[in-house]
Structures are given as structure tokens and as C-alpha cells.
Amino acid sequence: MALDLTAYFDRINYRGATDPTLDVLQDLVTVHSRTIPFENLDPLLGVPVDDLSPQALADKLVLRRRGGYCFEHNGLMGYVLAELGYRVRRFAARVVWKLAPDAPLPPQTHTLLGVTFPGSGGCYLVDVGFGGQTPTSPLRLETGAVQPTTHEPYRLEDRVDGFVLQAMVRDTWQTLYEFTTQTRPQIDLKVASWYASTHPASKFVTGLTAAVITDDARWNLSGRDLAVHRAGGTEKIRLADAAAVVDTLSERFGINVADIGERGALETRIDELLARQPGADAP
């Protein structure tokens, strides 16, 4: 069954052109990132993310108006772009952002897209699923050049066995992840997503995270801590309790929390997390 592009365009409020060009690619990345939130509520509640078919992803992110994590966002975007005539390859990445230099090598639990189209002159990277630091523009697969986006600049650097993606965060180049351009079959991504959504030590199982992007800000939620990052600085807000967290997920991040089931069960699970979060006794 083909993906329902009309439903997807309605979900992201897109009314523009659909021919496979760089302008259309930029527009889709922009509106997708501003409309469909990043969230990990399914893994948090013990629901594996192991069906990455176009039907399953469209059902959750489009029809049920939920968000998702990288395998869902980039999975859906890849299907959409392929339907529009782009050539899409799926890559795997190893997230190293905020890791200590001597930390153990992490598994490849991230995915991104390599996209080409008539006249592209090369490959563009598309990643609408990196949560709080999602690139808001397609990036040329070209090392060394600083590439502006609708938010902060990014750049790619060579590594012996591939590339690293870096972002300018607080006036410092920070490495987000390492990747190669080896095309990954769907089964590899399914296994990685199952691991990320079920392993007891996975951050998606042990903690709550959500993110959404606006024209001038990045809104990131980690547990009860809400951060609003703008060019002029960061505003930090500590939410009072689980009820406030659920309200924020619904009202600020646009997540259809009613789709998840009993609100009480979600609040109970979040309460468990907040009790373990540093500074849990502080309002």
C-alpha cells in the first residue's frame, strides 16, 4: 500500500510544490521539524518500536498525531521523499554527543538519510530525528565547509572510516555522531530500533525526552526540565510534577497524549522517573 502523501502534507500543513528539488527538500525538512515532535513515550511505557513499515509510521506520526524518535522520523521522511521521486539511502550512526572521551564505544542507534535528486550534484544528508539538535536544513555531504541552516551552523569532518557531524553550540563545535555512507537494509534498522526501545540501559527506556523546533527556538524536555534555546540564550523551567509534564507534552509539544491510553498510567511512570531525577525534591 502506497503512503498517503495527502494525509502527511495535511499533518505538517504543507501546501507547496512536490517536485524533487532542493527547495522542496528544504521546505519539507523545515515544516516536518516544526510540526511533528520528537518523543520517546512508547519505549518509556514498555512499547517496542519494532515496526518501521510506512503504514505503521504513518499511522502513529500522521493519523494518531504522535511523535517519535529517529527511526520513526527519518523512516517516515525517507518513504515520503522516495514517493516524491528522490533517491533515498538509509545510513546508520553512532551518537557520541556529550560522551566523555574515555566512554565505551556506543552502538549504532541512530539513522539518517542520504538524498539525491536530478541536478543535485551530489548527496544531501537529511536528519529530522535528532531530537534537541536536529539539523533544520539538508546538509551537503561535503567535509570542511560550514553549512548554515535555519538555526545554527553545522559541518562535516572526515574520519578514517567515515564522517562526523558537528554543530556550533554555544560558540563551540560539538560532535553529534559518527556515520558511514554504507546503505543499511531495513532489517538492520529494525534491529537497532528494537534495541534502542527495549534495552534496559537505553536512554529511551530510562528517561523522558521530547523536542520540537519553532522559527526562533528549540524546545527540549528532559524529565521535568524544560529548556528553551534561542540565539540570545537559554531559558530553563523546572516543571512542578508529572501532571505538569503531561500537560506540557500535550500543549507545548503537540503530542496527542490521549492516544497513549490512561493518563494516570503515564503520570505514574513519569512520577517514577522524577523521583530518580537529580534535584527531585526541588519544585
From Swiss-Prot:
User: Which family does the record claim for this protein?
Assistant: Belongs to the arylamine N-acetyltransferase family.
Assembly notes = Homodimer and homotetramer.
UniProt protein name: Arylamine N-acetyltransferase
Per the UniProt entry, how does temperature affect activity? Is thermostable. Retains >95% of its activity after incubation at 60 degrees Celsius for 30 minutes.
Catalytic residue list: C70, H110, D127
- Native species: Mycobacterium tuberculosis (strain ATCC 25618 / H37Rv)
Q: Which InterPro entries match?
A: Arylamine_N-AcTrfase, Papain-like_cys_pep_sf
Zinc as a keyword of this entry, yes or no, is no
| Further details from the record | Was identified as a high-confidence drug target. Reactions proceed via a bi-bi ping-pong kinetic mechanism.
Protein's job: Catalyzes the transfer of the acetyl group from acetyl coenzyme A to the free amino group of arylamines and hydrazines. Is able to utilize not only acetyl-CoA, but also n-propionyl-CoA and acetoacetyl-CoA as acyl donors, although at a lower rate. As acetyl-CoA and propionyl-CoA are products of cholesterol catabolism and the nat gene is likely present in the same operon than genes involved in cholesterol degradation, this enzyme could have a role in the utilization and regulation of these CoA species. It has been reported that overexpression of this enzyme may be responsible for increased resistance to the front-line antitubercular drug isoniazid (INH), by acetylating and hence inactivating the prodrug. However, isoniazid is an extremely poor substrate for the enzyme; therefore, the expression of TBNAT is unlikely to be a significant cause of isoniazid resistance in M.tuberculosis.
Question: Among the entry's GO cellular component annotations, what is one?
Answer: plasma membrane
- Catalyses which reaction? an arylamine + acetyl-CoA = an N-acetylarylamine + CoA
The GO terms this record gives for MF are:
arylamine N-acetyltransferase activity
- Under Enzyme Commission nomenclature, its number is 2.3.1.5
Can you tell which superkingdom this protein's organism belongs to? Answer: Bacteria
Keywords assigned by UniProt, alphabetized: Acyltransferase, Antibiotic resistance, Transferase
Q: Which GO terms describe its biological process?
A: response to antibiotic
